[in-house]
A protein has these predicted regions:
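Active-site SXXK
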Residues: 15-29
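Carbohydrate-associated surface elements
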Residues: 164
Length: 247
């Protein structure tokens, strides 16, 4: 897997841009069309997926050990040589818009965005990862190309590989594959901005007359990952309510 600092916090006012950019990586490369890419992976039973989250974007791959060379070359091609085909992008944008409309029918699908929007109002952590219909509809393939050029670089990127291989050989292989990945200007740390803590209790009610279920969140600002108690707090949180089997 490859992870980069290219998540939704860098969307600016173009909510959904990081997500669309990550998805568009698989729309073909300078060496393979989207169809050829999918056929190559299907033939060997491998997969390559892309994603964007709040803070990061990335690419993950699953494949048999014997196919490592082939798939790693595909990973490199997808990450470094995307063409951002305009027709495929428009199709993806329409699918995203349909998905955003469908999500409105399920409270649990949208509550994260409502909650983050209230808790982190005025901060980049309030940015909705999938975007909003009003912003996604205005994003162009040129916007995606610009975002890719600005944020898809080795600065701050990390590559992790788990499987049956010799560490030295794999390290040499990855170094060779990505040695020409050009560095750029590291993005500004837009998240390094104070978050205003609520001065009192806040309640946000979102009514949907035909809803068959009610979903609610209760919470507040947590601690920084750099806090020495972060892991302990995560464990306690998981015990109390972090999983289906929690109390």
């Amino acid at each position: 897997s490859v992870i980069l600092p290219a998540g939704a916090i860098y969307d600016g006012q173009q909510y959904g841009l990081a997500s669309l950019t990550a998805t568009a990586l698989k729309h073909g490369t300078k060496n393979m069309s989207k169809a050829q890419l999918e056929e190559e992976l299907d033939f060997i039973g491998a997969s390559v997926n892309t994603y964007a989250s709040k803070e990061s974007a990335g690419l993950s791959a699953k494949f048999a050990t014997k196919d490592a060379d082939k798939v790693l070359n595909i990973v490199k091609d997808v990450l470094l040589n995307p063409v951002f085909d305009a027709k495929e992008f428009e199709k993806e944008k329409q699918r995203t818009l349909v998905g955003l409309e469908q999500a409105k029918e399920s409270p649990r699908s949208v509550i994260d965005d409502y909650y983050s929007g209230m808790l982190y109002a005025g901060h980049v952590y309030a940015n909705p990862v999938s975007g909003r219909s009003s912003t996604v509809g205005k994003i162009s393939v040129d916007d995606v190309k610009k975002f890719y050029k600005s944020f898809y670089m080795p600065n701050g990127a990390a590559i992790a590989v788990v499987g049956d291989f010799k560490t030295g050989d794999m390290k040499a292989k990855l170094t060779s594959l990505f040695s020409n990945w050009a560095k750029g200007t590291a993005p500004t740390d837009v998240a390094n901005k104070p978050i205003s803590n609520p001065t009192g209790a806040q309640v946000l009610l979102v009514n949907k007359d035909d809803a068959r279920e009610t979903t609610f969140y209760i919470g507040g600002p947590g601690i920084k990952r750099s806090n020495p108690d972060f892991v302990a707090v995560e464990v306690i949180n998981t015990i109390l309510g972090g999983r289906f089997t929690s109390w």
